[in-house]
Regions:
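Extracellular glycan-modifying ectodomains
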Residues: 1-167
């Protein structure tokens, strides 16, 4: 295959993959996108069913996506680097644009929590680090720092303001 880099993560990875392609020295050929909306690529991550069914629908398969991507990575040549991009804040603290879900984790590892706690954040960080280090044993891993949270849907808000002439 002609793959040069794999971008993996949630919708934030999907939003940034074109920038990664643009950064390629010889054009965008070979940039592969493995993304699943609302699904942070973190080893051992489990989604809280009721919350994710409400947000994504009943056929949401985040854990299966993560397992698929991990399996695929083991079968690919080690010279293909991976770029991990996730909206970690939403997974750990809930969607800040949905006021009822603030400080309610959308994911868990060992036990489901109704509030974000320091213990949960430590476990969250441990899984991010362990997963990246495990991948780095076999290939180069790049992790994109968190994208700033705005607390509202920026494209929707700006388009409405533009339509109303308030922008």
């Amino acid at each position: 295959n002609d793959w040069k880099v794999i971008t993996v993560g949630d919708s934030h990875a999907g939003a940034l993959v074109s920038a990664i392609a643009e950064a390629q020295q010889n054009g965008d050929a070979g940039v592969v996108e493995w993304t699943y909306s609302g699904c942070a690529f973190i080893q051992g991550l489990k989604n809280i069913s009721a919350v994710n069914v409400a947000i994504h629908g009943s056929d949401y398969k985040c854990r299966e996506f993560i397992e698929w991507a991990e399996d695929r990575l083991t079968a690919l040549p080690a010279n293909i680097p991976i770029v991990i991009i996730n909206r970690y804040a939403a997974a750990a603290f809930g969607n800040n644009e949905h006021k009822l879900l603030v400080d309610v984790p959308l994911v868990y590892f060992s036990k489901v929590l109704t509030r974000t706690t320091p213990e949960f954040l430590a476990e969250f960080a441990q899984h991010i680090t362990q997963g990246a280090c495990e991948l780095a044993k076999h290939r180069t891993v790049y992790m994109v720092r968190p994208i700033p949270e705005m607390g509202f849907d920026v494209p929707k808000t700006l388009s409405r303001r533009m339509a109303l002439g308030v922008a």
